[in-house]
Each structure stands twice: as structure tokens, then as C-alpha cells.
């Protein structure tokens, strides 16, 4: 795999998102508890974050825990919260001396979130807010519909009576991120699952059948090459192509 060639390709997306799906099913295949799948998924995410940075991609969003995931068994939710606590500690240890900004998307005011997770998340965002390089956007207690409603209500509270697309974009959790180019959802499921609904309006999607803990760097490269082979039209078509086809 020629990383430098890939990295220097002008078609490389600037902002990608990962729906890290299939941890539980991966564990079940091996006769293990679902929580073990989350542990392996968490370890894989750390490797993939570094690889994404090495590729020169500017922004990475990761769907870690949805607003609907509270409906899972309490033991699993508790385990995930402990993983997030560990994840935030790792980010502080590994990233504070690098040009990496952390922006966490999701409802941090939710009383169901453990106070230690909430406090560490807010502190990490504050400590890295001056960084101008790579942006890592973990989405925790996040829902796309909830984010849109929050943006609308924030606009109203500011006295806006005519809300534009730019107003909405400015009030999303992702306001300081680049436009979303590419979404990868592992496990083969083909659903948005309430993830970045506004941001992904014209994003490209890719659905590898691999469960997240088994998704490799080679899998990511394959996904990126697939993205770069596509023609992004954003609802339009070039005049010469229209003439050829009609």
C-alpha cells in the first residue's frame, strides 16, 4: 500500500466519519460477551485514529454512543461509560502535546452521563481548543435529530426569525469542522441510524461487511479508494455529460 501516493491524492476526503458497528456481533461469533467486543473495538479505534492522521485527513468523526443506546442492557451501558472514561484519559495523555483538537458532539448536559465522563470531556475540549491541526470528533450521547432540534432552538433563543442553512450549520456541534465528505459504516448494515443527518446530506457512504474490531488499515484504504473513484455531483451534472447522455 503506497501511503504517500494516497496521502497526496487531491481526491482524498478532508472529513470522514466512522460508524463503528458490529462489536457485539464480532464477540458473539467467538462465544464472548458483547463487552469484550467493545473492548477490542476501542483498541482498534485508537489504531485507526493514528492511521487517519497519517493519511493527512483533517477531520475524523466517530459514532461512539447514540442517544438511543441508553436502551441497551445496563451492564453494557456501564461498561461503555467506563471505556469512554478510559478513552478520554488516553486522549489527554497521548494528544495534548500534538496538534490535535478534540470536539465532542452530543448532549453533555444529560444527567445519565457519569459526571467524571462529562467533566473530562469538557476539560479536554477546553485544553485543545487552540489546536489548529487534526480534529477528532467523538460523538457520545449523540443523535442527529436531537442535534438539529437543538440548533433550531438555539437560533430561536438568539432571536432569529428567518433561519438560513448557514445559521443551522453554525449552531451544530460540528460547526467548526469541515463539510462531511465520507461516511463508513462497518458490519454491512445500511442505515444512517440518526448519525450526522444534516452534515451527511451530500456525503458519500460505504458499507463494508466487516465488523468493526476486524476492520483493518487495508480496509480503510480500500474504502478511501472507493470514495476517490466516485464522481461527486452534489445534485448537478456537467453540460457535456448531459449532451452525451441525452
Protein language model features and the residues they cover:
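Flexible, compositionally biased loop and terminal segments
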Residues: 1-246
Amino acid at each position: 500500500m503506497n501511503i504517500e501516493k494516497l496521502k497526496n491524492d487531491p481526491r482524498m476526503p478532508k472529513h470522514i466519519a466512522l460508524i463503528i458497528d458490529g462489536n457485539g456481533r464480532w464477540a458473539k461469533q467467538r462465544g464472548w460477551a458483547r463487552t469484550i467486543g467493545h473492548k477490542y473495538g476501542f483498541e482498534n479505534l485508537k489504531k485507526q485514529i493514528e492511521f487517519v492522521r497519517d493519511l493527512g485527513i483533517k477531520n475524523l468523526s466517530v459514532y461512539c454512543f447514540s442517544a438511543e443506546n441508553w436502551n441497551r442492557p445496563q451492564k453494557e451501558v456501564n461498561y461503555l461509560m467506563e471505556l469512554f472514561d478510559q478513552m478520554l484519559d488516553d486522549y489527554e495523555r497521548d494528544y495534548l502535546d500534538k496538534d490535535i483538537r478534540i470536539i465532542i458532539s452530543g448532549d453533555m448536559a444529560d444527567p445519565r452521563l457519569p459526571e467524571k465522563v462529562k467533566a473530562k470531556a469538557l476539560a479536554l475540549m477546553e485544553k485543545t481548543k487552540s489546536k489548529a491541526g487534526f480534529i477528532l470528533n467523538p460523538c457520545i450521547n449523540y443523535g442527529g435529530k436531537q442535534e438539529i432540534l437543538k440548533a433550531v432552538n438555539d437560533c430561536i433563543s438568539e432571536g432569529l426569525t428567518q433561519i438560513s442553512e448557514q445559521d443551522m450549520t453554525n449552531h451544530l456541534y460540528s460547526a467548526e469542522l469541515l463539510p462531511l465528505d465520507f461516511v463508513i459504516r462497518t458490519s454491512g448494515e445500511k442505515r444512517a441510524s440518526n448519525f450526522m443527518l444534516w452534515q451527511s446530506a451530500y456525503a458519500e457512504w460505504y458499507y463494508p461487511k466487516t465488523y468493526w474490531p476486524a476492520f483493518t488499515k487495508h480496509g480503510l484504504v480500500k474504502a478511501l479508494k472507493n470514495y476517490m473513484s466516485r464522481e461527486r455531483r452534489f445534485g448537478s451534472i456537467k453540460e457535456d455529460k448531459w449532451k452525451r447522455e441525452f
